[in-house]
Curated annotation (Swiss-Prot):
Coiled coil: none annotated. A protein binds at residues 69, 71, 118, 122-123, 126, 162. Metalloprotease that cleaves hydrophobic C-terminal residues with a preference for -Phe, -Leu, -Ile, -Met, -Tyr and -Val. May function in peptide hormone and/or neuropeptide catabolism. The keyword Transcription regulation does not apply. Residues 1-16 form the signal peptide. This is Carboxypeptidase A4. Its cofactor is Zn(2+). Binds 1 zinc ion per subunit.
Amino acid sequence: MKWLLFFGALIGAGICGRDKFFGDQVFRINVRNGDEIRKLTELVNSDHLKLSVWKSPSTFDRPVDILVPSVSLLPVKSFLKSQGLDYSVTIEDLQALLDNEDEEMQHNEGIERSGDFNYGAYHPLEAIYHEMDSIATDFPELVSRVKIGETFEKRPMYVLKFSTGGGKKRPAIWLNAGIHAREWISQATAIWTARKIVTDYKKDPAITSILKKVDIFLLPVANPDGYVYTQSQNRLWRKTRSRNPGSRCVGADPNRNWNASFAGEGTSDNPCSEVYHGSHPNSEVEVKSVVDFIQKHGNFKCFIDLHSYSQLLMYPYGYTVKKAPDAEELDDVARNAAQALASLSGTKYRVGPTCTTVYPASGSSVDWAYDNGIKYAFTFELRDTGYYGFLLPASQIIPTAEETWLGLKTIMEHVRDHLY
């Protein structure tokens, strides 16, 4: 009871001091050729406009989503009109969505004073950690909570290990979520997945047989500092919270910081950029903690990273258009997983290699995993396709988690049957 009251007070205090986005809008822009992509890239790189890219300019069949501050609406509209670029407004007032989200969180805090964790709500970091503790306590024969490191701001990083025994280094699957702080549906889906595993073990033959052969390691919040900052200050924060010497800008993109074509295409050397790659590979302690743990273990067979948004299921590579050696098998597995996911509610996912499905992205977790011998490496971009973007309502958490579970389970079954 006390911890719930404490977190409720934190939420209330955080909401009062958070950045506001009154009148800010999200534009969806359709590009038709390379020249239009170039023009749009010039626009988003205009620092004085303070635009935030939600979906990057990449391919002609993929719309671009850009958050436009209210003070930049007129110049951006003028630019788009002058260049003949078609656009629509998908979010009329960003602050209105944020206010709804805040109200939902406060309402949920009141409900949870009964002591039950609501999986259909977004939670502060400590509430997620408390629930991880509860799962490990309730199912000690199957689950243990493991501290793998500390963040830049000295918060612990916790992983849940699901294992039926058989040695410390059995074949293993890594499930990652929340590496980009603002993608709240990924953290919420991950903690729901943790409860789903323990609930279905010995009841669902699929997950029971998976755990007979492999261990599952689940990191629900891969960027704790950033996640806390999204709830205390800036809901749309993406990066870590490390300090960059010589710059007023904070943090690096933890999914551009891995040693996989580091500092290559799709990254920036500008610390103020949302895709700043960091000073060197693994410069972010959150990334290094995962790398060290996985390398020390030495027997991971699968690495899955949960993100949002766009409804995509991708595999290596992100840093090159070159086909991965296992591309054909990975594509088959991903398509089967997407089909299983769609079987629940009809949610459609696009499947393909990262670089050609969305955009070039060097230094990603999944490419690092693949380059380090973890063959089954996948990225999920969860709901939606842009109507809410990163602000997916809490009412969609459980539907998203339930369908994602079907995709995850399909991949894990394939790993179970194709250990190498």
